[in-house]
Amino acid sequence: MKTFQITRPDETIREALTDKINNLTKPKGSLGTLEELALQIGLIQQTLTPELRHPQNIIFAADHGIVDEGVSLSPKEITWQQISNFLHGGAGVNFLCRQHGFELKIVDAGVDYDLPYEKGIINMKVRKSSRNYLYEAAMTEEEMNLCIERGAEVVRQCHAEGCNVLSLGEMGIGNTSSSSMWMTCFTHIPLELCVGAGSGLDNAGVHHKYNVLQQALDHYQGDGSAHDLIRYFGGLEMVMAIGAMLQAAELKMIILVDGFIMTNCILAASQLYPEVLHYAIFGHQGDEAGHKLVLDAMGAKPLLNLGLRLGEGTGAICSYPIIDSAIRMINEMDNFAHAAITKYF
């Protein structure tokens, strides 16, 4: 598997960043999370004047073999149909990208359909759909490695275009099931607490989904390593997102983490490279059952709670103005000395 050089941001500059933030014309700590974000981004970028450049949202798309077991309300053709909607600018993620100045990239990681690549979709297809992990591993070792490498390749291109802040989204009917499997495997939270309605299952549907996933977990006979669990239960788009996250961290980019699926992707990525979490900002707590639990297990503080459960990167993009405010705070606020204000704390 491709290896990455991911290190914790150098702490040498922390004191200078903290002093700058504390000497802005406000009571110490009074801008709360904005101050925390400015400090985190300053550490990532190793500067007292951090900046956000050319924000991009990458949607990785793929189909899932486990959908054959009736774990999703939506049929798998919704995956390619929604990609068509992205191309025509009519999806939720499209208006948010337009509103907040994000470039949108759509990546075919493993959609079970012949997509129109000439319309701008990035063709990184590893295979048409993952396999059904109720009976066998979702992907081979070679396919997993290709996903990691191709996700990293997409991010290197984003970085070459001047991007230093990256939101990651997904499109793949059945991917909440893979997310629930990773969540229970890596946090040891009982599976029943990790399984939710996904795109809209009723109580009976959720119960069936849980039973299928519990059978898959019971049948698993791998070595239990993070690498093997990612390969066995993962989605092609999710593993590609892991590669993207790891490459972004190596390049010292800011990673905006979206909802339940992307949170479990960075959870899985952190099993391989724990330092990746230093580069992550968690955009929101979504409405999918289990999202709060996995965020809490990671010690993550999401910026928003809007009851979202769409995916695509929508929650991460919604949080972007808050992050922009943190950058404007550290760069545009005056300090006590220059403003001739007595420092009163």
UniProtKB/Swiss-Prot annotation:
Quote the Pfam families the UniProt record gives: DBI_PRT
**Sequence intervals crossing the membrane:** none
> The organism sits in which domain of life?
Bacteria
Q: Does the keyword Transferase apply?
A: yes
Biological processes per GO annotation: cobalamin biosynthetic process
What is the annotated role of this protein in its UniProt record?
Answer: Catalyzes the synthesis of alpha-ribazole-5'-phosphate from nicotinate mononucleotide (NAMN) and 5,6-dimethylbenzimidazole (DMB).
Q: What is this protein called?
A: Nicotinate-nucleotide--dimethylbenzimidazole phosphoribosyltransferase
What gene name is listed for this protein? Answer: cobT
